[in-house]
Amino acid sequence: MDDSEVESTASILASVKEQEAQFEKLTRALEEERRHVSAQLERVRVSPQDANPLMANGTLTRRHQNGRFVGDADLERQKFSDLKLNGPQDHSHLLYSTIPRMQEPGQIVETYTEEDPEGAMSVVSVETSDDGTTRRTETTVKKVVKTVTTRTVQPVAMGPDGLPVDASSVSNNYIQTLGRDFRKNGNGGPGPYVGQAGTATLPRNFHYPPDGYSRHYEDGYPGGSDNYGSLSRVTRIEERYRPSMEGYRAPSRQDVYGPQPQVRVGGSSVDLHRFHPEPYGLEDDQRSMGYDDLDYGMMSDYGTARRTGTPSDPRRRLRSYEDMIGEEVPSDQYYWAPLAQHERGSLASLDSLRKGGPPPPNWRQPELPEVIAMLGFRLDAVKSNAAAYLQHLCYRNDKVKTDVRKLKGIPVLVGLLDHPKKEVHLGACGALKNISFGRDQDNKIAIKNCDGVPALVRLLRKARDMDLTEVITGTLWNLSSHDSIKMEIVDHALHALTDEVIIPHSGWEREPNEDCKPRHIEWESVLTNTAGCLRNVSSERSEARRKLRECDGLVDALIFIVQAEIGQKDSDSKLVENCVCLLRNLSYQVHREIPQAERYQEAAPNVANNTGPHAASCFGAKKGKDEWFSRGKKPIEDPANDTVDFPKRTSPARGYELLFQPEVVRIYISLLKESKTPAILEASAGAIQNLCAGRWTYGRYIRSALRQEKALSAIADLLTNEHERVVKAASGALRNLAVDARNKELIGKHAIPNLVKNLPGGQQNSSWNFSEDTVISILNTINEVIAENLEAAKKLRETQGIEKLVLINKSGNRSEKEVRAAALVLQTIWGYKELRKPLEKEGWKKSDFQVNLNNASRSQSSHSYDDSTLPLIDRNQKSDKKPDREEIQMSNMGSNTKSLDNNYSTPNERGDHNRTLDRSGDLGDMEPLKGTTPLMQDEGQESLEEELDVLVLDDEGGQVSYPSMQKI
C-alpha cells in the first residue's frame, strides 16, 4: 500500500470519527428537545376552558408566550410545515408531532400524538337553578393516540474536507418527518408527498413568517406565485406577484430569508456548512453566484432560485439548487432538499423541460434588465445563458434591440467577446449579430463606439471552429452596411478576413506550383458572410477599393471560388453573388485607380492636332488623301477586324491585374448565360460596363473579346428581364460596348428593339414604372448606338421609337433629365438628312424635334433653369464644328452635371443622380451600389444580415426548435 492510499484511509477514518462526534452532539440536542417537549405537553390539557385560540381552527394546542409559541426554531419549523404546507384541509385530528430524537447513535425515534376524530365523545349535563332556569352544558372529550417510531441511521463516510465522499453511499440516511397522513394515501399506500431516499430531515428552503402571518398553500407551491424561471414563454404573471422594478435588487446571500440550516440550533455554524454548501440563487452585483471553478459543468439535476411575492418581501422561499426539474417531478408538489453533496455542477439544463412539454405553469421568463445584469455575473454558465437568451429576445424584435442599447447592454456584450470560454463569447457574439441587424443604425454605431470591430477581429483570429467563425463574420457583415463603419472594417478586419477565412477555405494556393482544389463547400456559409462584408465595404470610396485590390490573395481567391462554383454547375448561390458583386465593385474606376494606371491610357480617336498640317479650318479638319483612301471612308477601328489578342505576359497575372484579364471576362460571360439570379446578372453586366469604360488599353481589348465570345446577344437579352436593375445594368454595358464601331453596328441591329420597348409610353405600360435613372440610361444608350450609325437610326424609326421620344418630350409629366435625354436622341435623329423626308411624310415636323423645357417637370430641381429651346444640329455640319462625338456638351443641358471623371456612369444610389448625362469627356464606370440600398438587400437579410432564433447557433434556413440551453 503506497503513501497515498494510507493517507486516504487515514483521512476517511478521521472524517468518520468526526461525524460520529457530530451525531453524538445531535443526539444530546434531540434528547434535550424531547425533555423540553414533554414538559410542555404536561401543561397542555384538552378542554374548552384552556383551549388555545388556534384550537378554533383545529390545528395546534400550544400556548402563546409573548406572541410566540414555546419551543425552539426546529419546533417552530415543524409547526409551520403543518400550518402552511399542508393547507387548510382537515387537520383537526393532528395535535402535535415531535422532531426525531436519537436514543443512541444509529437510531432515531419519532413520536406522533394524534387525535382520533371518530373517537370523540360528547358529555351533556343539565342543571336546574333555584329560580327554575335550566342550564345545559356539553363537553367534548377527544381520544388521543401516541405513536412512537424508531428508525435506523447509518453513518456517512466523510472526506478530508468534511463532506460526504460519494453521493451513492449516503442513500437512505435521513427520512422525512412529514405526518403519516402525508406519507400515505387514502388506500394506505405512499402518498404524493413522500420524497426520495436520502433527503434531509427539514427542508433547507423553509422561510417561515412572523407570527400572525398565515397563507394557506393548497398543494405545495402557491398557485399564483411568480416563480422565477428562465425561458418559460407560456406563463402569465399574476399582478399581485409581479415584482416592482423600482428599487429592485436581486436577492443576496446576506438576506435574512436565506436557506435554513438542516441541523438543530445546538450545532455550530461550522457543522452546518460542512453538511451543505450555499445554495444558488440570484445575487446582487457585488457577489458571485457560487463556485468560480473553471471546470464547472452543467448538471441536469440542479434548479435555480424561485421567487414568490415581491422582491422586497422576506416571506418567500428560494428553491434549492438540488431540486429536480422538468418531467422528473410534477410542478404541483413540494419536495424536500436531499443531502447536500460536494457538487461540480451549476444551473440546470432546460432539456427536460423542453422535451417533457410546456414548462411548469408558475415559471416566468426574466425581465430584460435582469438578463442584462446576468451578463456581469462571475459565473460563466449564467453569462452564457444570459447572452444566448438575449440573442433569442432580440430576434426580429427591434424594440428589444433598442432597449438593450439604452440599458447599456452592448458594452457588456462586446466585453464578453474576449472571454476565454467559447460558450460565453459565442453567446455574446450571437446577441451582437441580432442587435446589429435591422434598420436602427444607432445599434450599429453603439457597437462601433464600444470598439466592437477590433474585438470581433481578435475573436476571429482565435476562432478555429466553423460555427463561431460564421457568427463573427455574420456580425461584421451586418455592421458593414453602415457607411461610417465601412472604413473601420477595412482598416481592422480586411487582412484577418482574407488570411483567416477567404484564402484558407477557398482552396486557392499562393504558390503557383501547388495544386488548387476547391474545398470551400463545407465553409460556404462562412465564405458567404465574409464576401458579403467585403462587398459592402468595397462601395465606400476609392481608398477602400484600393486596399481591397492590393490585399494579397484576395482577388485570386475570389476568382477561384467563382470558377469552382461555375464548374460545379452552381452559378446561382449566394456565395457566387457576393463574390461577383465584390469583383464588380473592385473593377469600378480600375483604369484610374490601379498603380501606374497612366501606362494603360490611350488618346481619344479622331482628335486632331490644332497645329500642323491637319489643323482644323472653319469647315472642319483637313485630311490628307492618303489617310482618306487608306481608311476607305471607314472608321479607324475596322469593323472587319474581329480578332484581338491581349498583351503577352512574361508572368501569370496576380492580384488586381486579374480584374481585367481574359479569364475574368469569360467568368462574366458564363454567368450571363447560365445564371438566373437577378443580382448575379446585374453584377456581371455591371462589371463588364466598368471594364469597358474609359480610354485604356484593356478596355479596348475587352470590348473586342466580348464580341468574339458572342456576349453581345446575351447582354441584349437582359433588356427583357423583369427586374429593373438588370435592365439598367445591361443598358449601361451596351452603351460602353458601343464605343467599338463593330459592336455599335451589331447592337444597333439586335438591341434597338428591346431598348425602345423599355421606354415609357405606347402599348407597353410596364416601363412607366421604371425609375428616372433607368429611363435616362436607356435613352443615353440609344443615343450612343445611333450616333454615326444611320442603320441604327432607321431601326429606331421602324420600331416606333420616335413616338415614344416625342411623348417624353411633349407629355409634361416626365422629369427634366428625362426630357433632356430624349431631346438629345431626337436631335441626333434630325441630324440625318436621309431621315428628314421620310419623317415629314409620316407627319413629323421640325418642331417635334425641338425641346421646350417649359414642359419639363420642375419637381426634382430647386434651382432655376434655362427655358430656351435647344438648337437643332445638322449632321452634315458635325465634322466642321467639333470632332467625332462632341457635337453638344452635355454639361450645357443640365446645371447639375458633374465633371469628366464620372461620365457614362450609373447614378450613385446615395443620392447623387446627376452623372448620367455628362458626356463631355471619356467614358465612365458603373458606380458601386451603396447607401440606402446596400449591395445586397432583401427582407430578413440586409446585406444578408442574419438573425437567428436559436441559442446554439445554426444557419437561418434550419432553425432549431429550442436547442439545449441552461436555465438562467
Swiss-Prot record:
Q: Which coarse location class applies to the principal site listed for this UniProt protein?
A: other
Q: Where is the composition biased (Polar residues)?
A: 889-908
Give the consequence of mutating W363A.
Severely disrupts cadherin interaction
List the PROSITE patterns hit by this protein, alphabetically: ARM_REPEAT
Locate the site labelled Essential for interaction with cadherins.
Answer: K401, N478
> Which residues are recorded as modified (Phosphotyrosine)?
Y112, Y217, Y221, Y228, Y257, Y280, Y291, Y865, Y904
Show the segment(s) annotated as Disordered: 855-944
Disulfide cross-links:
none
- Mutating K401M: effect? Complete loss of cadherin interaction
- Tell me the outcome of changing W477A: Severely disrupts cadherin interaction
GO biological processes: cell migration involved in sprouting angiogenesis; cell-cell adhesion; cell-cell adhesion mediated by cadherin; negative regulation of blood vessel branching; negative regulation of D-glucose transmembrane transport; negative regulation of intracellular signal transduction; negative regulation of transcription by RNA polymerase II; positive regulation of protein localization to cell-cell junction
Which ranges are annotated Basic and acidic residues under compositional bias? 875-888, 909-922
Q: Summarize tissue expression.
A: Expressed in vascular endothelium. Melanocytes and melanoma cells primarily express the long isoform 1A, whereas keratinocytes express shorter isoforms, especially 3A. The shortest isoform 4A, is detected in normal keratinocytes and melanocytes, and generally lost from cells derived from squamous cell carcinomas or melanomas. The C-terminal alternatively spliced exon B is present in the p120ctn transcripts in the colon, intestine and prostate, but lost in several tumor tissues derived from these organs.
Q: Which GO terms describe its molecular function?
A: cadherin binding; cell-cell adhesion mediator activity; phosphatase binding; phosphatase inhibitor activity; protein sequestering activity; signaling receptor binding
Which GO CC terms are listed, alphabetically?
adherens junction; catenin complex; cell-cell junction; ciliary basal body; cytoplasm; cytosol; extracellular exosome; midbody
Role according to the record: Key regulator of cell-cell adhesion that associates with and regulates the cell adhesion properties of both C-, E- and N-cadherins, being critical for their surface stability. Promotes localization and retention of DSG3 at cell-cell junctions, via its interaction with DSG3. Beside cell-cell adhesion, regulates gene transcription through several transcription factors including ZBTB33/Kaiso2 and GLIS2, and the activity of Rho family GTPases and downstream cytoskeletal dynamics.
Family stated for the protein in its record: Belongs to the beta-catenin family.
Q: What is the protein name for this chain?
A: Catenin delta-1
| Species per Swiss-Prot/TrEMBL record | Homo sapiens (Human)
